[in-house]
């Protein structure tokens, strides 16, 4: 049975009950379908993932209002797919405590939802076939659309307008190539979100596109207390944050303690609030820095 350890409304009270409705009406099932109760069936394993990651079928009830409620007035019988990452399947990392990656996945969703970023599919804690872990609604990504957002091209084929070159290298045949990303407002929202949560692994494969939306996935190594921002989305480095982006950052900072107390430790929450303060004071997206590898590898 699916046992949701923390529903969307479990994180705080009062102001912390605000949802991403401030960013307009939800228009994608990955933002509105919250698994409530039911069974998880393993469909297959996603072998390319570094940790144990399973495609699952969830059969049972789910809330479709974006925020669960105790009386389940919004519940409907449903069958949907998700990505299940059991805690016991986490690979040890030298710089992140073992057994915390699933909580960080859920924390990233909560920041996205609460701040109104709407860039992370619904993610909850659940008891699955291999024990507790994170459970995220599956997004059927449109590969052609992703290619219009992040791409790998010959250096002499980098477009003059609408794209940012991020890093250059060499292909297997020693021909020069460049990683580029689009100057796209949806992608920029993901870049702002990553700067706030200190995402250490924004690869091209962690960017999905579906029904006009852009999503980020794989947030298990976010929220470190040290600066570990590592991303392909450096095209807006140093650019001024918009008032809408600043409002989202302030919203998260103001509600961070209640929002994330069950998911992150005090030092990690404090570091999040300090990053928010730094972004607000500077008013700009951060630049890459020299004391950390700022491009994920491999980039795709």
Task: Locate each region found by the language model.
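Short capping loops/turns at secondary-structure boundaries
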Residues: 101, 182-189, 200, 226
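C-terminal catalytic region of ATP-dependent kinase domains
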Residues: 4, 97, 210-300
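Repeat-unit-sized solenoid/scaffold elements
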Residues: 14-18, 140-169, 220-230, 281-300
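Non-catalytic, low-structured ubiquitin/UBL-interacting segments
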Residues: 1
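Intrinsically disordered, low-complexity terminal tails and inter-domain linkers enriched
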Residues: 7-26, 61-77
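N-terminal, Lys/Arg-enriched amphipathic/low-complexity engagement segments
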Residues: 20, 30-35, 42
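Conserved ATP-binding subdomain of kinase catalytic cores across diverse folds
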Residues: 36-171, 176, 192-200, 204, ...
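ATP-dependent phospho-/nucleotidyl transfer catalytic cores
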Residues: 133-196, 233-243, 247-274, 279
């Amino acid at each position: 049975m699916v046992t949701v350890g923390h529903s969307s409304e479990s994180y705080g009270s009062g102001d912390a009950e605000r949802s991403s409705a401030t960013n307009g009406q939800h228009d994608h099932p990955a933002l509105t379908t919250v698994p409530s109760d039911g069974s998880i069936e393993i469909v297959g394993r996603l072998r390319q993932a570094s940790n144990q990651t399973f495609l699952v079928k969830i059969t049972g009830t789910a809330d479709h209002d974006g925020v669960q409620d105790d009386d389940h007035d919004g519940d409907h019988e449903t069958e949907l797919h998700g990505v299940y990452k059991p805690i016991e399947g986490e690979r040890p990392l030298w710089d992140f405590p073992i057994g915390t990656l699933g909580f960080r996945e859920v924390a990233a969703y909560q920041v996205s939802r609460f701040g109104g970023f709407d860039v992370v599919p619904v993610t909850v804690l659940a008891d699955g076939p291999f024990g507790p872990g994170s459970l995220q609604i599956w997004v059927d990504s449109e590969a052609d659309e992703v290619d219009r957002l992040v791409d790998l091209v010959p250096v002499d084929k980098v477009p003059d307008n609408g794209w940012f070159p991020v890093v250059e290298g060499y292909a297997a045949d020693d021909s020069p190539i460049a990683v580029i990303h689009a100057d796209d407002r949806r992608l920029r929202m993901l870049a702002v979100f990553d700067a706030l949560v200190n995402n250490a692994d924004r690869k091209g494969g962690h960017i999905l596109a579906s029904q006009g939306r852009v999503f980020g996935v794989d947030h298990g190594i976010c929220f470190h207390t040290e600066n570990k921002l590592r991303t392909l989305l450096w095209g807006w480095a140093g650019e001024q944050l918009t008032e809408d982006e600043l409002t989202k950052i302030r919203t998260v900072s103001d509600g961070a303690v209640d929002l994330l107390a069950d998911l992150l430790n005090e030092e990690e929450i404090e570091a999040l609030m300090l990053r928010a303060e730094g972004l607000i004071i500077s008013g700009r997206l951060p630049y890459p820095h020299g004391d950390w590898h700022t491009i994920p590898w491999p980039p795709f």
